[in-house]
Structures are given as structure tokens and as C-alpha cells.
Design a protein with these regions (language model features):
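Active-site-proximal segment of RNA-dependent polymerases
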Residues: 8-70
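Surface-exposed helix-capping loop/turn segments at secondary-structure junctions
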Residues: 17, 160-166, 199-203
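A common structural junction motif
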Residues: 82, 192-200
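Non-catalytic, well-ordered alpha-helical scaffold segments
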Residues: 1-5, 9, 34, 38, ...
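Conserved polymerase palm-domain catalytic core
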Residues: 43, 49-171, 176-187, 210
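Right-hand nucleic-acid polymerase module
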Residues: 1, 5, 116-133, 137, ...
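Beta-rich nucleic-acid/ligand-interaction surfaces
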Residues: 27-35, 175-178, 209-213
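PAPS/PAP-binding and catalytic site of the sulfotransferase fold
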Residues: 7-10, 191, 195
Length: 300
């Protein structure tokens, strides 16, 4: 892991960052989920000032994104910017463990997405006769850089070739705002061609063109405008359902002494502080009641 951090910090990031668009928001210093959400909000407000709330949002999602990044094309794309055989050899060594023996199936993985979890759970015979050199895992430094860097041709196509002003990407999630639905359809078809050239797959179930008046969801936030033109940013319901379950688990852990009451309070308030900036006051008040009920039980 130390090697990966050194490679990314000293070589890959300095070499690749100048080629990234500003609205590529993941895993970079000074950026992240909060950055991407703020940029989308800024884009929506600017769009509204220019065009009102008439228009559309194109939301695109890559299917099994990290599982389907081809090692050879990823390394070639980095090598074109770094030009160092030692770096290429390191990348080949670091990515090799993610290659999979798929000799148990004759599935054409150029036509359908590879699923590493399904592959892991499959008990078919493997004889090493067919190795799939894809997947970069999730979480490792090189994997994160791969997710940020590899779809750059899609970013360039949208921002430079198609002049999409209101465009942003967070790893495998993309949004584009425009007043012309036909234009967005044309851009989507172009992105499909770019994705095919990269060996990536677009999730048709999660890819939609939605009227702005209806609102749309991106990175777990529902964006919509009120009749008066105010932008609303509401976390999806799942956010609070999951936290309610977590609160119950924390309460049970505190009740049996595995965590302290102070830990229980700090963990909840830490989570809550991340959501107070959004339009979810009623949901937070409801969850606060659950929090206080558990806290009262712990203190008596």
C-alpha cells in the first residue's frame, strides 16, 4: 500500500491532473462528494438564470465500472502521459492480482459487463485457459486514480467536442444539463461510442433524461425547483432509513458496553452535521427524536 501511495502521489497525480477537467470531482485534493454536489447546485442555479426551469437533465451511470476497466487500455492511457517503463511495469504488477480466471464460462465480456462479485461466488471449474485482464478493485490508491482518469475521453468529448457547459462526473456517475432534449440524446449516443471504445458499459436502467421540472437524483441527492424558482436539495429517503438502522445498532452496542454513551452521541452528531446544509429539516427532526429516545434509555 505504501508503494501505491508513493506511485500515485509522486508520479501519477502530477502527470495526469493537468489533463483532468475541473468538474471531475472524485478522489482529488480539494474535491470529493461535497465538491461535486456544490458544482451541480451551481450549474443548476446558473442554468435557471439563463433558461428558467425549462430543460432536461441527462444522468448517466457506468455499469460495474471498476470491474470493467481493461488493464491494457488503462496502462496505455497512463503510459502516453508518463512515458516511463518503470511506471508501466509497476502498474502491470499492481493490476495483475485483479485479473480473473473465467475459464468456467464462454460469456463474451466484450458484450456484457464483468461482475467480480458474481465471479467470486461462482463455483464452476477453472483451468487457467481463459484469463480476463479487467477490474481494478475498489479503494486502493491506484484503483481510485484509475476511476478518476480512465473515462477522461468521455469528459473531453462532452466538454470540448460537444461544448456541454453544465457537465460533471463523479467516478462512474455523470450529469449534463441542457435545454434541448434532442441534443442530450445526441450526446448520449456519442458517450455510448466513447464508452465502447474504452471497454466500458452504460447502465441503461440508471441512465435517464429527465425534465428539470420533475427533479432528478444524483449521488443520493434529489434536486428540484420550487414554483418560485428556489433550488431544493433533498437527500434520498434511503439515507435516513439507513441511519435509523445504524442508530439502533449503536444503541445496542452502547447498552451492552461495547461503545460508550459519548461515542454514541459523537457518531450521531458527526453524521448529522453532514446533512444540515440540505433541505431535510423534518427528516432530521424525526431522527433526532429517535436519537434522544435511545439516549434517555442509556442514561437511566
Amino acid at each position: 500500500m505504501v508503494l501505491q501511495h508513493a506511485l500515485c502521489d509522486a508520479v501519477l497525480l502530477p502527470a495526469l491532473t493537468p489533463y483532468l477537467i475541473y468538474d471531475n470531482g472524485a478522489s482529488l485534493k480539494g474535491k470529493g462528494m461535497a465538491f461535486t454536489r456544490a458544482r451541480l447546485a451551481a450549474h443548476l442555479r446558473e442554468y435557471q438564470r439563463r433558461y428558467g426551469t425549462d430543460g432536461y437533465a441527462l444522468k448517466i451511470d457506468f455499469a460495474k465500472f471498476f470491474d470493467n476497466i481493461p488493464h491494457d487500455r488503462l496502462i496505455d492511457s497512463i503510459d502516453a502521459k508518463v512515458r516511463d517503463s518503470r511506471v508501466r511495469s509497476l502498474l502491470e504488477m499492481l493490476l495483475a492480482p485483479y485479473s480473473a480466471d473465467v475459464s468456467y464460462t464462454d460469456t463474451d465480456f466484450d458484450a456484457v459487463p464483468y461482475n467480480s462479485l458474481a465471479d467470486y461466488e461462482t463455483s464452476g471449474p477453472r483451468d487457467g485457459s481463459r484469463i480476463l485482464h479487467r477490474s481494478v478493485g475498489i479503494g486502493a490508491p491506484v484503483s481510485q486514480i484509475a476511476g478518476v482518469w480512465y473515462p477522461t475521453p468521455v469528459d473531453t468529448y462532452c466538454k470540448v467536442v460537444r461544448s456541454c457547459r453544465y457537465y460533471g462526473r463523479y467516478m462512474d456517475d455523470i450529469y449534463i444539463l441542457h435545454h434541448d432534449r434532442d441534443f442530450l440524446m445526441s450526446v448520449l449516443n456519442g458517450i455510448r461510442r466513447q464508452a465502447h471504445a474504452l471497454g466500458l458499459f452504460i447502465s441503461e436502467k440508471k441512465t435517464h433524461i429527465t425534465p428539470l421540472r420533475q427533479g432528478f437524483t444524483f449521488c443520493k441527492i434529489r434536486y428540484s425547483f420550487t414554483s418560485g424558482g428556489r433550488l431544493l436539495m433533498r437527500p434520498v429517503r434511503e439515507t435516513f432509513t439507513r441511519e435509523r438502522r445504524r442508530l439502533k445498532t449503536l444503541y445496542q452496542l452502547a447498552a451492552c458496553g461495547k461503545i460508550s454513551v459519548t461515542d454514541y452521541k459523537d457518531l450521531y452528531h458527526s453524521w448529522r452535521s453532514g446533512w444540515i446544509r440540505f433541505d431535510c429539516h423534518r427528516s432530521l427532526i424525526s431522527l433526532d427524536k429517535t436519537y434522544r429516545r435511545y439516549l434517555n434509555d442509556l442514561q437511566h
